[in-house]
């Protein structure tokens, strides 16, 4: 296994000193945002993690290796490269064997983080159960990963284009705690509201670190969703986003868009109808998650 994992100099030095490390995914760079905002955001997020006392480790697949921590040049390459594969659990073996470029999803980043001994991972939002999943079976592999891999995911909830109710049902079945950081309502990515409750509200990084520590000491496999609402100033109105999604769903149906094609269509509509506000919101929430994630990593590190 070790032959596949390559730590960056910064991560190697951090681990040797016993510093807290925070994992970051790379699909947000390759697939989540346009260039050059993607690379700029990735660099800023890494810096926020450093400023809050932890070491950033952006994870990606390059040349048959799992890179834990990317150089500036590698970040730039991911931001610009064409045809980067989106890597989830099923793709890791193939992409390493064929030495293709792979950007890691939430699921794959969790796997790689656990292999590298990293427990805390910051991202934008998690995947979930898609609308209409009762017929399409379209459920993100992120949820299954949360059920079996010991990594906490700090995120701004799940995107409202998903079926949030079913996503929570699935996580409940799998025994994955959904924790609200300073909130009793699950945030829905661009918006602070979803109309659904979290399982527990915790208000400090220390409390979250203690919960994670107790969970894993009991040998309870699986991660946790730490839902951190987008900052008020950048949040989009819950009603506004819901309205856009309802309209887009009708349009999708009228145009015969089905199954796997619905999500990209909805995302495109949200982007178009928010007039780019969704990109600003996306950047703001990831940065906010980086602050919280770094603080949780510091607190968790102090317990161990």
Curated annotation (Swiss-Prot):
InterPro entries: Indigdn_synthA-like, PsuG. Its EC number is 4.2.1.70. One of its GO terms (cellular component) is cytoplasm. The active site is at residues 25, 159. One of its GO terms (biological process) is nucleobase catabolic process. Substrate binds at residues 86, 106, 140-142. It comes from the Bacteria. Mn(2+) binds at residue 138. Pfam families: Indigoidine_A. Its cofactor is Mn(2+). Binds 1 Mn(2+) ion per subunit. This is Pseudouridine-5'-phosphate glycosidase. Belongs to the pseudouridine-5'-phosphate glycosidase family. One of its GO terms (molecular function) is pseudouridylate synthase activity. Homotrimer. Keywords: Glycosidase, Hydrolase, Lyase, Manganese, Metal-binding. The gene is psuG. It catalyses: D-ribose 5-phosphate + uracil = psi-UMP + H2O. Catalyzes the reversible cleavage of pseudouridine 5'-phosphate (PsiMP) to ribose 5-phosphate and uracil. Functions biologically in the cleavage direction, as part of a pseudouridine degradation pathway.
């Amino acid at each position: 296994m070790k032959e596949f994992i390559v730590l960056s100099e910064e991560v190697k030095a951090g681990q040797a000193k016993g510093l807290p490390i925070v994992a970051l995914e790379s699909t947000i760079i390759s697939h989540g945002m346009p260039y050059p905002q993607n690379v700029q955001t990735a660099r800023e997020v890494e810096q926020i993690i450093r400023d809050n006392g932890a070491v950033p480790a952006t994870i990606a697949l390059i040349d048959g290796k799992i890179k834990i921590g990317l150089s500036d040049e590698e970040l730039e390459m991911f931001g610009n490269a064409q045809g980067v594969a989106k890597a989830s659990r099923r793709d890791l073996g193939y992409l390493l064997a064929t030495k293709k470029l792979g950007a890691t999803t939430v699921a794959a980043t969790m796997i790689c983080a656990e292999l590298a001994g990293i427990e805390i991972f910051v991202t934008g939002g998690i995947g979930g159960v898609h609308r209409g999943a009762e017929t399409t079976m379209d459920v993100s592999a992120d949820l299954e990963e949360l059920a079996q891999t010991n990594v906490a995911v700090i995120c701004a909830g799940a995107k409202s284009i998903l079926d949030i109710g079913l996503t929570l049902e699935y996580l409940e079945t799998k025994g994955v705690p959904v924790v609200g950081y300073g909130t009793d309502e699950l945030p829905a990515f661009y918006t602070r509201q979803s109309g659904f409750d979290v399982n527990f509200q915790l208000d400090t990084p220390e409390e979250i670190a203690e919960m994670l520590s107790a969970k894993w000491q009991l040998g309870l496999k699986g991660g946790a969703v730490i839902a951190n609402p987008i900052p008020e100033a950048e949040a989009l109105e819950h009603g506004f986003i819901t309205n856009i999604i309802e309209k887009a769903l009708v349009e999708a149906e009228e145009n015969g868009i089905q199954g796997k094609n619905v999500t990209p269509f909805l995302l495109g509509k949200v982007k178009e109808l928010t007039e780019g506000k969704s990109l600003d919101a996306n950047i703001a929430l990831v940065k906010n998650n980086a602050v919280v994630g770094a603080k949780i990593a510091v607190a968790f590190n102090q317990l161990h």
